Design a protein with these regions (language model features):
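Conserved phosphate-binding/catalytic region of the ribokinase-like
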Residues: 11, 15, 42-151
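Conserved beta-alpha-beta core of the PfkB/ribokinase-like small-molecule kinase fold
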Residues: 1-47, 67-69
Length: 151
């Protein structure tokens, strides 16, 4: 299982893409690596995702800051928004928390849509606290936000 967050967005050899199970760039990385002018909305995220799938990636999830995230695996596509009333204090570890939530979902054998939701919820918890290590969500915090948001 290969989960790849391409930060920073440096050129990736085309032959490497076929080994990636979950490719999770942010909007800027998706734009840079796809060659598209912008990846600012769901339509553009789908365009970028198709480019990565054409290169061999199995699933793409683009994190889209305060918009949420977009995922496409060649069969299903989902745009998941963030829960209401998330107050951003520090976004320094949001991507890392997203990856952790996604990984938790994968380890639990969840469906694709739930993987994106797990990542979004984890990132939302992280941005509400300052710092990197201290902002990583606990299971208790994760479960609480999951229940509160209904996701």
């Amino acid at each position: 299982m290969v989960i790849w967050d391409p930060a920073p967005a440096n050129k990736i050899p085309d032959e490497a893409y076929e080994y990636i199970d979950y490719f999770i760039p942010n909007q800027t990385e998706a734009q840079t690596l796809s060659g598209l002018e912008d990846v600012l909305n769901e339509k553009q995220a789908m365009e970028a995702s198709k480019i990565f799938l054409d290169k061999g990636v199995k699933s793409v999830i683009i994190t889209m800051a305060e918009q949420g995230g977009f995922g496409y695996n060649g069969i299903e596509s989902y745009f998941i928004d963030i829960p209401d009333d998330i107050k951003v204090i520090d976004s320094v570890a949001a991507g890392d928390a997203f990856s952790g939530g996604l990984s938790l979902g994968i380890s639990e054998g969840l469906e694709f849509k739930k993987l994106i939701i797990y990542g979004i919820l984890s990132g939302c918890i992280a941005v509400q606290k300052p710092g990197a290590t201290d902002s990583m969500p606990t299971i208790k915090e994760f479960t609480s936000l999951q229940v509160k948001s209904g996701k």
